[in-house]
Design a protein with these regions (language model features):
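Short glycine/serine/threonine-rich phosphate/pyrophosphate-binding segments
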Residues: 15-25, 46-47, 84-88, 105-115, ...
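Glycine-rich oxoanion-binding loops at beta->alpha junctions
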Residues: 1, 46-102, 110, 134, ...
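A short, small-residue-rich loop immediately preceding and capping a beta-strand
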Residues: 5-13, 18, 96-109, 175-176
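Short, ordered loop/turn segments at secondary-structure junctions
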Residues: 11-13, 34, 39-45, 77-78, ...
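N-terminal phosphate-binding or glycine-rich loops at protein starts, especially the Walker A/P-loop
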Residues: 1-50
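Accessory alpha-helical/coil subdomains and C-terminal extensions
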Residues: 36, 93, 101-106, 112-116, ...
Length: 260
């Protein structure tokens, strides 16, 4: 197969380390005699047939990129319906740009996109995916975490430690919700490292639908146990995936609860 351009595209939400991946991938490719371009704006311009949102990546441009935050190529979140509707346009745009090798940087959704592109290309485009997500919900060989997770965990730990001091000083409880989508990796990582009083993650509950009362009883029990020990304060870490498991019919019975 004729070696055309290597393309790099970022999908999904932001996470620490994106520019470092762009930089290292581009430098390695250039040192092997390849030309590299970045797609500015994630998959959105590709889905719209835009061939102008292309940034040539040179060593001068990316050599210090790893020291900066964010993404030089920006990113986008694309609805599954729009992706399916305009997927043929995306494939045609990649071909027009001249990309024969594609590096996708993103989480679970971008991983599926990479798979679809590889299947649709039928050997005309090689695809490599760099797993990026603070959720750490992509299983990797050797138990490695996805990039972005460790930094998010570290930052979260520092925040929780400060809140724990407020909790102790004020004699009150704080409930903290962490990101993580359907998984509790980030919540558990932060909770363990910070020494939070209690951490609730969805993996602890085998039932498909979690009773709101059950979750509330667990948190209430933790508060009561602390009081029996003479401690009137604490910090609970709650993974956002817990809310995904709640029975909405049960929640409707609690009129005073604001449902986000």
């Amino acid at each position: 197969m004729n070696k055309g351009l290597i393309g790099i595209v970022v999908g999904g939400g932001p996470a620490p380390g994106i520019n470092g991946v762009i930089s290292s991938a581009a430098i390695e490719a250039i040192n092997h005699g390849r030309k590299v371009v970045g797609i500015v704006g994630g998959f959105k311009p590709l889905l719209e047939g835009d061939t102008k949102s292309v940034l040539p990546l040179t060593i001068d441009l990316v050599s210090r990129l790893h020291t900066t935050g964010g993404s030089i190529l920006r990113t986008s979140r694309d609805a599954p319906g729009e992706v399916k509707k305009h997927f043929k346009t995306l494939m045609a745009t990649l071909k027009k740009i001249g990309i024969t090798d594609l590096i996708t940087i993103g989480g679970e959704g971008t991983l599926f996109m990479a798979k679809w592109i590889e299947q649709e290309a039928r050997g005309t485009i090689n695809v490599v995916h760099a797993p990026k997500t603070i959720d750490n919900d992509i299983p990797l060989p050797g138990g490695f975490s996805t990039f972005g997770y460790q930094t998010a965990r570290h930052v979260g730990v520092e925040i929780v430690k400060n809140i724990m001091e407020d909790s102790r000083t004020m004699g009150r409880w704080y409930f903290i919700t962490t990101m993580g989508r359907y998984t509790g990796h980030l919540a558990l990582g932060i909770g363990k490292a910070a020494g939070a009083t209690i951490t609730l993650i969805p993996e602890e509950f085998s039932e498909k639908r979690l009773s709101f009362k059950k979750a509330a009883d667990i948190l209430t029990g933790s508060i009561i146990k602390r009081l029996s020990m003479g401690r009137d304060h604490g910090v609970a870490i709650i993974a956002e995936g817990i809310a995904e498991k709640f029975d909405m019919e049960e929640l409707a019975k609690y009129e005073d609860i604001e449902i986000d």
